């Protein structure tokens, strides 16, 4: 059975990069009729918080990325919080030590820092110098008796090559002499990502690992651990990272926001999944797709090796497409029942068909509810100046035209054209701004049908002031 996984650390809120990794793993599993697993990697005791843990799970559920195995689901391979798996890791540490494939390291952080500095100054890549690699049993006991707490290092074999096939990047080769012995247990007894991540993937039956390319150099180390313990090895695929438009790491200055913030601002889950699924993955269809359709079209071979550039406008495009396809009940659940309650029942259908194609967020709906049923709205400085420059006569003639022709916009515009000898923008724009406060938006003729006649009169009179 094919099984992919998403294993976030609960040290912060979920961001777009996390969400895309989760989505790709979900789509990959669904495309193969496989299992999507969630594991919480909370070994960083100081930074891991339960609020972040629950928030990550809430965000995944909101995105409809339901896991079949993990917290609150099938827990047959659990526990799925690494903080509860230390006894498992300790057992494998013991196996490695007994096989002389791991050894205690008493080097201080200062010693390691100095060693790296010397290596860099000599033009060599920084790696562990092997200071504690050959300590005798007596030397080890002496250091422990002195109260020194050792870390545990994996003994990397000399003069070998670690080779693996990456589904995105092809064959990868790493010289073990460039890796150096690495820490698999900290001096305080806790397990670093490198070790427990690999152990858990093997024990939980993960067959495929899709993760960011920043983990590429971790893979040979994890392969060495799994091979030493004779544990199954997953297939790896390292995906390109998301960057800003300028090619630098994605950040808030590029307009990137966390999933919770996007949700709170009215973004819809299907908009995010349609955007993220195409961020570094090619789809032939440019239509809004369901999660099932996205999964059907997902192919690891369609993942790009090049960094995926974040584009806020593209995200907003998919948001608008998603809003436009919402069933009416879902639309009002998203926009808010308090807005729906402000619309007279006899005008609800016309309002929805008129406004829906022109809104992207609940705040947009609120704006047009106020335009159609509110008393006043604030104009921007440039709009106020345009109305003043248009002159009172325009609005006086418009006032009279509405009295004469009612809500027939074509007749009103023809009247203005005849009386004022106007055409194009000068003919239409002042009327739209005076009545709606916006230069663009839904079809004006339909908005006028929705508005009360008194509202139209009042706004034309205000434009004369």
Swiss-Prot record:
Pfam families: Anticodon_2 (PF19269), tRNA-synt_1c (PF00749). GO terms for biological process: glutamyl-tRNA aminoacylation. It comes from the Bacteria. GO terms for cellular component: cytosol. InterPro entries: aa-tRNA-synth_I_cd-bd, aa-tRNA-synth_I_codon-bd_sub2, aa-tRNA-synth_I_CS, aa_tRNA-synth_I_cd-bd_sf, Glu-tRNA-ligase_bac/mito, Glu/Gln-tRNA-synth, Glu/Gln-tRNA-synth_Ib_cat-dom, GluQ/Sye. It is an enzyme of class 6 (ligase). Its EC number is 6.1.1.17. One of its GO terms (molecular function) is glutamate-tRNA ligase activity. A motif ('HIGH' region) lies at residues 8-18. SUPFAM superfamilies: An anticodon-binding domain of class I aminoacyl-tRNA synthetases, Nucleotidylyl transferase. A motif ('KMSKS' region) lies at residues 249-253. ATP binds at residue 252. It is found in: Cytoplasm. It catalyses: tRNA(Glu) + L-glutamate + ATP = L-glutamyl-tRNA(Glu) + AMP + diphosphate. Disulfide bonds: none annotated. Belongs to the class-I aminoacyl-tRNA synthetase family. Glutamate--tRNA ligase type 1 subfamily. Catalyzes the attachment of glutamate to tRNA(Glu) in a two-step reaction: glutamate is first activated by ATP to form Glu-AMP and then transferred to the acceptor end of tRNA(Glu). HAMAP family: Glu_tRNA_synth_type1. Monomer. This is Glutamate--tRNA ligase 1. It comes from Coxiella burnetii (strain CbuG_Q212).
């Amino acid at each position: 059975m094919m099984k992919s996984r998403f294993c976030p650390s609960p040290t912060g809120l979920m961001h777009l990069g996390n969400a895309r990794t989760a989505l790709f793993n979900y789509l990959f599993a669904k495309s193969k009729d496989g299992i999507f697993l969630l594991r919480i990697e909370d070994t960083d005791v100081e930074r891991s918080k339960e609020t972040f843990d629950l928030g990550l799970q809430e965000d995944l559920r909101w995105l409809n990325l339901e896991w079949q195995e993990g917290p609150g689901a099938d827990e047959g391979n659990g526990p799925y919080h690494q903080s509860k798996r230390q006894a498992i890791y300790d057992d494998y540490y013991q196996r490695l030590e007994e096989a002389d494939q791991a050894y205690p390291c008493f080097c201080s952080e200062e010693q390691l820092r100095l060693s790296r500095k010397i290596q860099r100054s000599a033009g060599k890549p920084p790696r562990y110098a092997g200071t504690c690699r050959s300590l005798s049993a007596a030397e080890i006991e002496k250091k422990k008796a002195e109260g020194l707490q050792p870390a545990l290092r994996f003994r990397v074999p000399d003069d070998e090559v670690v080779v693996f096939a990456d589904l995105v990047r092809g064959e990868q080769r790493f010289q073990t002499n460039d890796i150096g012995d690495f820490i698999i247990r900290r001096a305080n007894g806790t397990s670093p990502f490198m070790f427990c991540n690999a152990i858990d993937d093997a024990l939980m039956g993960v067959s495929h690992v899709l993760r960011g390319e920043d983990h590429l150099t971790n893979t040979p180390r994890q392969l060495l651990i799994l091979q030493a313990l004779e544990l199954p090895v997953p297939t790896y695929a390292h995906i390109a990272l998301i960057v800003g438009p300028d090619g630098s790491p994605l950040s808030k200055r590029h307009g990137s926001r966390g999933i919770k913030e996007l949700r709170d601002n009215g973004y819809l889950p299907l908009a995010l999944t349609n955007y993220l699924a195409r961020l570094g993955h090619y789809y032939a269809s440019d239509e809004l797709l369901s999660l099932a359709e996205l999964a059907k079209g997902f192919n690891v071979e369609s993942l790009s090796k090049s960094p995926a550039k974040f584009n806020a406008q593209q995200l907003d495009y998919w948001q608008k497409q998603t809003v436009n396809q919402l069933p009416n009940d879902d639309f009002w659940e998203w926009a808010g029942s308090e807005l729906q309650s402000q619309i007279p029942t006899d005008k609800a259908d016309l309002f929805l068909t008129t406004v829906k194609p022109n809104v992207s967020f609940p705040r947009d709906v609120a704006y047009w509810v106020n335009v159609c049923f509110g008393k006043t709205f604030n104009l921007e400085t440039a709009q106020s100046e345009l109305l003043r420059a248009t002159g009172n006569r325009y609005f006086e003639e418009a006032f009279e035209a509405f009295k004469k022709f009612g809500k027939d916009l074509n007749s009103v515009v023809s009247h203005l054209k005849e009386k004022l000898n106007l055409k194009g923008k000068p003919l239409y724009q002042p009327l739209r701004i005076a009545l709606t406060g916006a230069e663009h938006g839904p079809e004006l003729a339909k908005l006028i049908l929705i508005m009360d006649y008194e509202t139209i009169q009042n706004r034309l009179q205000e434009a004369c002031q």
